């Protein structure tokens, strides 16, 4: 992967009305972010969007955007990335469910109308997920595995997938993982009940879902975006009704040029662990 230059960073103030989320948010997390923003008085890191048909599909930062909307702001600072280019990688998070009795989980899932829970052979899970022939796979603690199936177009399926996740979200601990290998997960989460594994989405899926006003469950899509702009610390007053977007973006251009000129923009290509979010 080539090295990014600071001049390639695309930052812009845009209207919140033009920002289209593709995933659900968590009201509890939104409330927490509202408190943090009110306390700090600035937006630390801009949400990430892809520009499409004069709209902005939100790839990362749904909680921040929902918080700003709930606070009554008109605009938001975003970082715009090329969703069709090689620099953005769309992957998936799987959900580790902890503390919910497996029998209760299965019974509750069976009660979701229009969802089919079908037992499958353990050797077919990867194949089904890669081929995107299922909406999800359920891997129980004892190794029993099930396919989650439903009918309809992609927006219909997302509505049902959100209902599936609602069965356990808020009723058990839910942790994100990049794999569904049970032995190491049980070692990490001794009270693991099950793992819900999801197929990878395509960027075209995310765009279609956002444009149609549908939502993917929170914590499923995983966008890997090198060159994220962090630590801008833009005052919240810049998200308000005045001045115009043109004036805000002129101010932003001057700010970015000044920080580049003063060597205050640095690229860290190595992976890092963040403990304060």
Predicted features by range, described:
Residues 1-55, 59, 63-83, 87-98, ...:
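Short, charged/polar connector segments at secondary-structure boundaries
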Residues 98-159:
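Internal, conserved structured core segments that host functional sites
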């Amino acid at each position: 992967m080539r090295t990014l230059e600071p001049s390639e960073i695309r930052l812009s103030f845009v209207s919140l009305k033009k920002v289209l989320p593709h995933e659900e948010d968590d009201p509890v997390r939104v409330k927490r972010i509202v408190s943090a923003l009110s306390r700090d008085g600035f937006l630390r890191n801009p949400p990430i969007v892809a520009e499409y048909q004069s709209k902005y599909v939100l790839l990362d930062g749904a909680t921040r955007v929902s918080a700003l909307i709930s606070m009554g702001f008109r605009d938001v600072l975003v970082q715009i990335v090329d969703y069709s280019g090689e620099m953005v990688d769309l992957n998936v998070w799987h959900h580790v469910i902890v503390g919910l009795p497996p029998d209760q989980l299965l019974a509750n899932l069976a009660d979701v109308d229009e969802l089919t829970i079908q037992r499958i052979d353990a050797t077919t899970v990867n194949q089904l997920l890669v081929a995107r022939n299922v909406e999800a796979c359920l891997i129980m603690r004892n190794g029993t595995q099930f396919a989650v199936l439903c009918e309809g177009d992609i927006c219909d399926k997302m509505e049902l997938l959100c209902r599936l996740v609602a069965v356990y979200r808020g009723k058990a601990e839910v942790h994100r993982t990049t794999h569904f290998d049970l032995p190491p997960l049980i070692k990490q989460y001794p009270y693991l009940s099950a793992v819900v594994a999801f197929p990878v989405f395509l960027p075209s899926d995310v765009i279609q879902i956002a444009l149609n006003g549908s939502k993917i469950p929170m914590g499923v899509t995983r966008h890997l975006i090198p060159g994220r702009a962090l630590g801008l610390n833009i005052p919240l007053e810049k998200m308000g009704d005045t001045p115009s977007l043109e004036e805000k973006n002129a101010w932003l251009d001057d700010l970015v040029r000044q920080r580049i000129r003063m060597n205050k923009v640095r690229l860290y290509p190595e992976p890092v662990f963040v403990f304060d979010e």
